[in-house]
Amino acid sequence: MVREEVVGSTRALQWKCVESRADSKRLYYGRFILSPLLKGQADTIGIAMRRALLGEIEGTCITRAKSEKVPHEYSTIAGIEESVHEILMNLKEIVLRSNLYGTRDASICVRGPRCVTAQDIISPPSVEVVDTTQHIASLTEPIDLCIGLQIQRDRGYRMKTTKNSQDGSYPIDAVSMPVRNANHSIHSYGNGNQKQEILFLEIWTNGSLTPKEALHEASRNLIDLFIPFLHAEEEDINFEENQNRFTVPPFTFPDRLANLKKNKKEIALKCIFIDQSELPPRTYNCLKRSNIHTLLDLLSNSQEDLMKIEYFRIEDVKQILDTLRKHFAIDLPKNKF
């Protein structure tokens, strides 16, 4: 078989952004359509895209805060309206936009009385605060507030460790999820065999990226997951008996095992399980109780050995012999070697 390089979609699919708006600095909305799709394809794409949008896109957030002379997370500081815990929760909500990789340091250093907001965060040039008005703390007295911050790019949700650091730093639940929500719906049109579908995809983001950017990144991530299958070569699959990495999927014997009879030497017999056979439930259960799970296990026994199995009858042995002869051209010896 000649393998052709896949250069793109073979169908004339078109996508379009039909609605886009910014409800606030931290809430963007986009609505997209993809068509024409065959029946069932819209749901397949919609489910995959939603999972990729919610779980595969990286985001940047504050993961740790450090301040001196703070005994514990639930303590209060004179001259600050919020407790340390409330300040950490406010830092958790800060939305950042960046393309950094790894960990970066940032800081807050202000003097009261004043209101501390995200605008007061001193961050690297590669990090941008999406909404500078986000509240962090209220200083009610002329005191200094200095907080060291750790910024990290990741994906998904990572809970903080419960143990506080000895150096006065406190971990923050990392919510690296730029997409706040994603939904898909399907519109069908046409009649009979000509029925087609339109996929509607709705995306809400936190402002660190637009819905269109999120759609592009999710699509790239999905493509990256499937690329290995495009380059997989069938001849690389090894069926040697000494490698127990390949399991023959369940199949019915009359049709699928016809080919197995011709190629029995190429397939690891220990990877063919007896539950893939046509053996009656009673015979199957007796074999399992005797720790006979694979075809290789079965062939390691003689007819005499099988007759020693508890509750095993001569009819059961005959059934096994018929199955082996019919589908594998294999016979069991009457006695042990």
UniProtKB/Swiss-Prot annotation:
Cell membrane found in the keyword field: no
Gene3D superfamilies listed in its UniProt record: 5' to 3' exonuclease, C-terminal subdomain, DNA-directed RNA polymerase, insert domain, RNA polymerase, RBP11-like subunit
Reaction catalysis annotation: RNA(n) + a ribonucleoside 5'-triphosphate = RNA(n+1) + diphosphate
Coiled coil start-end: none
GO cellular component: chloroplast; DNA-directed RNA polymerase complex; mitochondrion
EC class name: transferase
Keywords from the UniProt entry: Chloroplast, DNA-directed RNA polymerase, Nucleotidyltransferase, Plastid, Transcription, Transferase
EC nos: 2.7.7.6
Gene Ontology terms for molecular function: DNA binding; DNA-directed RNA polymerase activity; protein dimerization activity
Region (Alpha N-terminal domain (alpha-NTD)): 1-233
Quaternary structure, from the entry: In plastids the minimal PEP RNA polymerase catalytic core is composed of four subunits: alpha, beta, beta', and beta''. When a (nuclear-encoded) sigma factor is associated with the core the holoenzyme is formed, which can initiate transcription.
Domain free text: The N-terminal domain is essential for RNAP assembly and basal transcription, whereas the C-terminal domain is involved in interaction with transcriptional regulators and with upstream promoter elements.
Function: DNA-dependent RNA polymerase catalyzes the transcription of DNA into RNA using the four ribonucleoside triphosphates as substrates.
NCBIfam families: rpoA (TIGR02027)
Family classification: Belongs to the RNA polymerase alpha chain family.
UniProt-recorded name of the protein: DNA-directed RNA polymerase subunit alpha
Species assigned in the record: Acorus gramineus (Dwarf sweet flag)
Lineage of the organism: Eukaryota, Viridiplantae, Streptophyta, Embryophyta, Tracheophyta
